[in-house]
Structures are given as structure tokens and as C-alpha cells.
């Protein structure tokens, strides 16, 4: 048996070598590390496009009056595309597709993912999906104007009768394909984690990042089919005369909102849970301590995932639901703060008494804890139906979810990037450049989004191209912040270029005694086929 395993290993090595020598190696590779790298490159490209759109939005809002988007529908298209791109083509491919594919098999001691060829198509569906979304901006949406400008939520009737052209149809197909990609990926992750752990690695010994990916995969598997159903009904309403969401045919536009948010709320937890997992590893590594309350951390994530499915209507307080219904959703939403608080305090307890090293990944992780907490506090404010009466669809909501996404998920992605970059590439980045990137984006995004709380409380509504002069001051501050953040993206790309240009080699484990998971026992970068003899976990 040992001989055959070794022989198989040699054969696999040769195949892996050919794969990279061949010009189509990247395209056809079924290796989880190659696919993870493709996901990360795709996420960076999509992120730059999405960030460019947000810069255009903030440039327009810098001063009152319509300045750049003289075709005002185009502004709505930018807002819509920015949202869809950042969620479906940047955060999800980076966290789940990128870091998930790269490190989940390494962490659990698996030779690869359970279904490597399915993994390949999970990735390649995404460029197709992205292409459809970009195509939608070049065909008619509203009469006489190109592109889908219904918001990333695509609420009816704006996305049905409000957009008679084919743009929204293309956007719907784009979401279908992105959803198919995520469902296939989720099946792959669940199977891999349940069936391919190294001998001795029970579920309760599994690294927290692996747990976060498992829970995220279940959320994807349960929520995406609901989105698929909703947008398919929207498609038939638009093209085939059905009236699922059209009152004149006995339909209900609120049904769309319920279906959408039944997907949409688990989705925002899908966007942050893998980040929780990454942050746990980074805090533990740079505090030189095991995570405080491991089991509590696992079940807190599971509780967040479960509760995420029963709070969706807190996005809909103003649609006229029954008061008892609203009371339920207020209470359920606030209960999610409990497991989230367990995680925050466990991270702080992990650092307590630790030998903390403020390396770049640790800076991102510390900023994540602070800024995610700010986003959580404004979330508790918005959970109150009575307050949401006033704050719904104002910039207060924009500030809230950008604090948990732009200053939460993105900070977690960058934390993971700087933490694992030496392992993925075999090179060390320039610490000074990396810290400059951190401080620049930290100042930038806080300048953008903190003042937006004030705008929201003052009553400035979201998704408008123009605003009364009274809101000019904080909008100027916000837009200046977006220029700083935009520059930080360029610095990040230069930082990556610099690391590959300088070629500073790195050992198996650049982080020292704090890094205890299996990937740090492998060379940097790992061989094409790791774990030919499965590791045994004690």
C-alpha cells in the first residue's frame, strides 16, 4: 500500500509539473491551490472595477448638483453594479473561493477538494457571470437609457415595468450563474470537510477557519435556491406574462422582497463568517496563544448562521407588516448580537495576556474587531422598527453596512491576504509598504463612512444623484475619504508587485510559534500535491 501510494505520488507530481508547463495549465487545472489563486486574481480585478465605480459615485456626490452623470439613469446603474460586483465578484470569490480553496484542504490535511473538476467549473462560471453583468450595462434598461439601475436588490416594480429593456434580464442571468457557481462550491466544501479530514481530526479539533467555511457553505446551499426562485419569477413576470409580483394579476410585490431578503440576510453572514474564521487564526497567531473559548467560537458561528435565516424582514420594517410580526423581527435581530458579542469578547480574551506582535495582518485584525463592532452597534440601532421608520433608506443604513462590509469583510480579506501571502507565493512582502497600505485605507474608509451616519440622521436618502445644499459639508468629507481609499488600492497593487519583484524568500512558517495549523508545516509555496502521506492529528 505504501509503495503504491508513493508511486501514485510520483505520477501526480509529474502530472502537476506538466500542468504548469502547458500553456493551458491554469485553464484546465483542478488543483485547489491553482483554483484558489484564480479566484483571488479574479476578486482583485473585480474589486478594482467595483472600487472605480464607488469613486465615480463619490465624485458625483462631492458637491450638490448633477456634475458628471448627466444621464442620471447611469448613476443608478453605477450604484447597482457597484453593489453586485463587490458582493458576488469580490468578497465571495476572495473569501470562500480564494482563501477557502487555498487553505481549507491544507488545514484539514486533505490532498485536495472532494470534487476537483467541479471546483474548476465553479470558478469558470464566474467570469461568464461577470461578463453578463457587464453586458447588461450596454443594452437598454429604462426607456431610452442603458443598463440595469434597479439597485442590487432589484425590487419590483422598478426591475419589472420600470425596466422594459433587456438589461435587467441579463443581470438576472448573471445572478443565476453566480448562484450556480456558489452552490457547486458549497457542495464541494461540505463534502470535503465531512469526508476528507486527516485521521484524528475530529470536527471539534478542526481549525476555526474550516468551521467558518463549513457554516458558510450550508448558508449558501440553503439561501441561494430561494434567490434563484425569486429572480426566475421576476424573469417570467418580465417576459412571459406571469404575475407573481404584479398586483393587477393577483400577485404581490412584497412577496419578492420576502424571497429576496430570505436569501439576502443569510448572504450578509456568508460575506462575514469566513472573515470571522480568518480573524480568529490571525489574532491567535500574533498573540502567541490558542483562541479563547474554541467551542464557544464554533457554536457562536453556528448560532449566527442559524439565526441569520429568521430575521430577514428587518429589511422591510416600512412595508406595513403586522405590529406583532415587527416585534418578533426586532427581538430576533437583537438576539444575533449575543453570539456576535461572544466572538468579539473571545478575540479580546485571546489577546489578553498574550505576547502580541503588531505585524501587518494583526493590524488589519485589530482594526476589524473595532470597526466591525461599530458596524454592529449601528446595526442594533437599525434593528428597532421604530427608529428604522426614520432611518430606513437613508445614509445611516449605507454607513452601517459599509462598516461591516467595507471596514469588516474587506479588512478581514486584507488580513488574510497579508497573513497567507508568504505561504501562497513563497515571498515576503515589504512590511513598510504593507503598513502604509493599512493606514491609508484605514483613514480613507473611516473618512468616507463615519460622516454618513450624520447625513443619515439628518435625513439624506440613499441612491440619489443630487441632494439639498444642507448636506454638502459631510458629503465633501466623505468624497475626500474615497479618494484616499482609491489611492490605497494603487498602493496595494504596487505592494504585490514589489513582493514579486524583490523575491525575498520565506520559510515554512514566517510567523513563529503562534501559527499552529497544518499549512505552516508545509513549504512556502506548498508542493503541487501536498499530504501524499496523510498527516495524523493528535
UniProtKB/Swiss-Prot annotation:
* Principal EC category: translocase
Give the pathway.
Energy metabolism; oxidative phosphorylation
Quote the record's binding site residues for heme a3: 400
PROSITE patterns to which the protein is assigned, alphabetical: COX1 (PS50855), COX1_CUB (PS00077)
SUPFAM superfamilies under this entry? Cytochrome c oxidase subunit I-like
> InterPro entries recorded for this chain?
Cyt_c_oxase-like_su1_dom, Cyt_c_oxase-like_su1_sf, Cyt_C_Oxase_1, Cyt_c_Oxase_su1_BS, Cyt_c_oxase_su1_dom, Cyt_c_oxidase_su1_bac
* Alphabetical GO biological process terms: electron transport coupled proton transport; oxidative phosphorylation; respiratory electron transport chain
| Crosslinked positions (1'-histidyl-3'-tyrosine (His-Tyr)) | 265-269
Q: Where are the transmembrane segments?
A: 37-57, 84-104, 121-141, 170-190, 208-228, 259-279, 291-311, 329-349, 362-382, 401-421, 438-458, 476-496
GO MF annotations in UniProt? cytochrome-c oxidase activity; heme binding; metal ion binding
Instruction: Tell me how this protein sits in the membrane.
Output: Multi-pass membrane protein
Q: Which GO terms describe its cellular component?
A: plasma membrane; respiratory chain complex IV
Q: Which UniProt keywords apply?
A: Cell membrane, Copper, Electron transport, Heme, Iron, Membrane, Metal-binding, Respiratory chain, Translocase, Transmembrane, Transmembrane helix, Transport
Which CDD domains does the entry link to?
Cyt_c_Oxidase_I
Recorded catalytic activity of this chain's protein = 4 Fe(II)-[cytochrome c] + O2 + 8 H(+)(in) = 4 Fe(III)-[cytochrome c] + 2 H2O + 4 H(+)(out)
Compartmental location: Cell membrane
Residue spans of biased composition, Basic and acidic residues class: 8-22
Q: Which residue intervals make up region (Disordered)?
A: 1-27
The catalytic activity of this protein is classed by the Enzyme Commission as: 7.1.1.9
Q: Where does Fe(II)-heme a bind?
A: 82, 402
Question: Record-annotated residues binding Cu cation?
Answer: 265, 269, 314-315
Q: Which NCBIfam families match?
A: CtaD_CoxA
Q: What is the annotated role of this protein in its UniProt record? A: Cytochrome c oxidase is the component of the respiratory chain that catalyzes the reduction of oxygen to water. Subunits 1-3 form the functional core of the enzyme complex. CO I is the catalytic subunit of the enzyme. Electrons originating in cytochrome c are transferred via the copper A center of subunit 2 and heme A of subunit 1 to the bimetallic center formed by heme A3 and copper B.
Q: What's the family?
A: Belongs to the heme-copper respiratory oxidase family.
- What is the protein name for this chain? Cytochrome c oxidase subunit 1
Write down the species.
Rhizobium leguminosarum
Source species taxonomy: Bacteria, Pseudomonadati, Pseudomonadota, Alphaproteobacteria, Hyphomicrobiales
Instruction: Name the encoding gene, please.
Output: ctaD
Amino acid at each position: 500500500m505504501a509503495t503504491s501510494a508513493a508511486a501514485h505520488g510520483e505520477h501526480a507530481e509529474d502530472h502537476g509539473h506538466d500542468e504548469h508547463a502547458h500553456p493551458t495549465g491554469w485553464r484546465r487545472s483542478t488543483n485547489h491551490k491553482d483554483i484558489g489563486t484564480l479566484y483571488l486574481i479574479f476578486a482583485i480585478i473585480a474589486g478594482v472595477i467595483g472600487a472605480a465605480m464607488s469613486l465615480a459615485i463619490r465624485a458625483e456626490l462631492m458637491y450638490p448638483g448633477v456634475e458628471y452623470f448627466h444621464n442620471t439613469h447611469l448613476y443608478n446603474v453605477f450604484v447597482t453594479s457597484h453593489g453586485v460586483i463587490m458582493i458576488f465578484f469580490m468578497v465571495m470569490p476572495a473569501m470562500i473561493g480564494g482563501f477557502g480553496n487555498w487553505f481549507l484542504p491544507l488545514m484539514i490535511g486533505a490532498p485536495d477538494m472532494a470534487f476537483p473538476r467541479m471546483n474548476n467549473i465553479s470558478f469558470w462560471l464566474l467570469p461568464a457571470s461577470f461578463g453578463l453583468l457587464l453586458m447588461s450595462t450596454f443594452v437598454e434598461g429604462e426607456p431610452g437609457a442603458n443598463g440595469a439601475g434597479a439597485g442590487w436588490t432589484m425590487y419590483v416594480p422598478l426591475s419589472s415595468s420600470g425596466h422594459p429593456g433587456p438589461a435587467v434580464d441579463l443581470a438576472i442571468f448573471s445572478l443565476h450563474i453566480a448562484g450556480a457557481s456558489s452552490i457547486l462550491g458549497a457542495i464541494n466544501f461540505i463534502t470535503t470537510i465531512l469526508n476528507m479530514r486527516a485521521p484524528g481530526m475530529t470536527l471539534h479539533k478542526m481549525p476555526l477557519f474550516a468551521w467558518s467555511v463549513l457554516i458558510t457553505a450550508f448558508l449558501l446551499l440553503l439561501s441561494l435556491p430561494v434567490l434563484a426562485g425569486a429572480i426566475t419569477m421576476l424573469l417570467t413576470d418580465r417576459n412571459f406574462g406571469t404575475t407573481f409580483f404584479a398586483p393587477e394579476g393577483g400577485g404581490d410585490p412584497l412577496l419578492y422582497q420576502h424571497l429576496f431578503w430570505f436569501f439576502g440576510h443569510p448572504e450578509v453572514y456568508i460575506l462575514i463568517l469566513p472573515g470571522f474564521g480568518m480573524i480568529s487564526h490571525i489574532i491567535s497567531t500574533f498573540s502567541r496563544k490558542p483562541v479563547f473559548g474554541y467551542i464557544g467560537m464554533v457554536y457562536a458561528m453556528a448560532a449566527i448562521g442559524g439565526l441569520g435565516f429568521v430575521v430577514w424582514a428587518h429589511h422591510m420594517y416600512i412595508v406595513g407588516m403586522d405590529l406583532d410580526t415587527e416585534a418578533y423581527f426586532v427581538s430576533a435581530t437583537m438576539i444575533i448580537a449575543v453570539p456576535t458579542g461572544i466572538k468579539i469578547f473571545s478575540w479580546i480574551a485571546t489577546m489578553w495576556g498574550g505576547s502580541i506582535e503588531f505585524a501587518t495582518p494583526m493590524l488589519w485584525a485589530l482594526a476589524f474587531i473595532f470597526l466591525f463592532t461599530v458596524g454592529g452597534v449601528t446595526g442594533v440601532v437599525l434593528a428597532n422598527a421604530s427608529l428604522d421608520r426614520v432611518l430606513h433608506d437613508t445614509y445611516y443604513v449605507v454607513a452601517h453596512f459599509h462598516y461591516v462590509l467595507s471596514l469588516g469583510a474587506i479588512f478581514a480579506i486584507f488580513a488574510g491576504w497579508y497573513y497567507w501571502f508568504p505561504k501562497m507565493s513563497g515571498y515576503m512582502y515589504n512590511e513598510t509598504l504593507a503598513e502604509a497600505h493599512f493606514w491609508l485605507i484605514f483613514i480613507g474608509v473611516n473618512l468616507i463612512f463615519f460622516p454618513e451616519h450624520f447625513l443619515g440622521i439628518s435625513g439624506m436618502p440613499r441612491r440619489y444623484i443630487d441632494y439639498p445644499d444642507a448636506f454638502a459639508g459631510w458629503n465633501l468629507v466623505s468624497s475626500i475619504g474615497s479618494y484616499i481609499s482609491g489611492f490605497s488600492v494603487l498602493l496595494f497593487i504596487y505592494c504585490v508587485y514589489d513582493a514579486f519583484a524583490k523575491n525575498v524568500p520565506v520559510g515554512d512558517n514566517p510567523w513563529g510559534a503562534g501559527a499552529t495549523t497544518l499549512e505552516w508545516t508545509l513549504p512556502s509555496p506548498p508542493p503541487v500535491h501536498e499530504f501524499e502521506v496523510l498527516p495524523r492529528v493528535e
